[in-house]
Amino acid sequence: VIIAMLFALMMIAKLFSIPTGFADLRISFTYVFFALIAMMYGPMTGLIIGLCSDTLGFFIFPNGASFFFPYTIQAAISGLIYGLCLYKKEVKLSNIFFTRLLINMIMNVIWGSLCFGWLYGYDFATTCAYMLTYSLPKNLLWLIPQTAVLYICLKAFTPIVKRFSN
């Protein structure tokens, strides 16, 4: 029941992203619920939630883009990373920073850029240019704010996590 409620909140949070004026750069708090689920129930649950949220999100909130399964893999592995880094661990700023660093750099910058290049048929040089000039700066810019928000939220939810996690 708790997973379903948090998953529903995660899906609702997808509706409330704030555009920044750049192409796909939006401020969203979906990752907070994603991390909370993985922190409470572990890496496999995080992986499954990633698969479900990306797939259901595509059908519930269509944005005109094509469904592209490698992005679903990105969401699933991100959930796995959240679970591996946060499950049954004390909420510490260094741990949250490391988790976000892994997700931002490996999943968002590297995997996300490769998916972007593959989806749009870009050659490797163009994909690398996108990675270095757009994806890397964007993810570095948001690393500290995402870490801070995630730390504050997970710290606030720690008593609930201790009560309801398995």
Regions found by a protein language model. Give the residues of each.
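Loop-helix junctions at membrane interfaces
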Residues: 1-166
